[in-house]
Amino acid sequence: MKSGTEGATTGGMADRLDHVSVATRKIAAMVPLIRDVLGARYLMGATEAAHGFRWAQFQFPGGGIIELLEPVGSDGFLRDFLKTRREGLHHVTLRVRDIEARMRELEDLGWRPVKPNFENPAWKEVFLHPRETHGVLIQLAESELPYAREIEYYQQLDLEELMASS
């Protein structure tokens, strides 16, 4: 039963909105808008060459985070996404605790989580496909690291390096 309204409470499995992710051909092309016009500060970023993408997160004064994704290499999920859907919203990430239990709960409720990846304790994830979520890819994520340590763990590139490689 997917409606979620029967027996619904104000609680839920998501602890908080983590970030909104935008697919772009070049992160460097988005930085002037995100940083200089809208006022976000660079938080962290890295190149995930094995997965065919680079990412950069920017935090706004109120705490909201936008993540920019750009493809690296000649193929991969992000390059495919940009070919079929063009630049724009890629996914919304929600933080959860005990992600494996949350995945089972979703399945029990009739949802079909896809692409679970629980190998890295610093970032465990599972997705809800846009076909089931009114066109929005939803990522549920859990990290065993405190948030400050996540930034330290993932801040592999400073912004200038990231933009130069973009």
Spans of model-derived segments:
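Regulatory and interaction patches adjacent to catalytic/ligand-binding sites
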Residues: F81
